């Protein structure tokens, strides 16, 4: 990381008004599952800049390249994925993308008396990324022939092409230094096009988990009214192209580092088109509101100033999955309707 812009043509006056860094990154991820082994290697060049009070921040991913490689998979793993669109997410592919993230808050800096008693503050985050356009343009320019499935390849490897956007807004009201309530709403959508017919698995949205609808474990909710019934491929099918989240959380400081949280979560994910392995998962304006999952729960937090440890217990209130009890809030079953989450930091 360089403590200034490594970018030509920028005026000196602009560089003096902002706090900026240039970041060169390399990443390596190794994932071992019973069904497959996956390796993701990447490199990127990005810029960060913020105003002097750190209330507005920008991140520009100028270029980010990831290579997803599956050296081995269980013999029946890909065979169990009958939908060829989902199979694509578990084959070797490139992701060459660019993106931009904007972040703004009116929350005052933490050093000072005013911050401790600021009654209302908000944060807003919006991001967009796109992938595959440069490679697709080069394929067209040099007259590369498409494969039988209608896609281009680079070094005989597929590359993804899509656009994806996300917006999140959080508002917090303090009743006193020890009591507050926080509201969060979020929306995201990803659309494949050109060289892709589906988003790569690592770019699709998922629901449930410590930062989602906490009545469900991660990747066990949605899309839509879809109900998973195959333990081998559930984690593949329970992801989507659209996400919608609403959360409300009351937070109270008890004593020492201990805090209490009470929350209500709502949301789900959907696909933008019909997939054979995700029935009832597509987003429809006349149905999506009926497929919004609801959860409630309590949590304990340990605030050590520099980091916070969180333990939440969530319970299902409304389950949109077909064939399940639709309103478990009236007939709760602990083993069926509860989920425990351990995480670091607030959910929003």
Can you say where each PLM-predicted feature lies in the sequence?
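Short coil turns and loop connectors of transmembrane beta-barrels in diderm outer membranes
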Residues: 51-53, 175-179, 254-258, 305-306
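C-terminal outer-membrane beta-barrel translocator/porin domains of Gram-negative envelope proteins
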Residues: 1, 58-252, 262-285
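Conserved C-terminal beta-signal and adjacent last beta-strands/turns
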Residues: 244-252, 260, 266, 293-304, ...
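Short Gly/Pro-enriched loop/turn and capping motifs at secondary-structure junctions
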Residues: 255, 267-271, 305-307, 316-320
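Short amphipathic alpha-helical interaction segments
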Residues: 236, 240, 288-292, 303, ...
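Strand-loop-strand
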Residues: 2, 278-304
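Gram-negative/organellar outer-membrane beta-barrel architecture
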Residues: 1-125, 214-215, 221, 226-228, ...
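Short, well-ordered alpha-helical packing segments
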Residues: 46, 164-170, 184-186, 297, ...
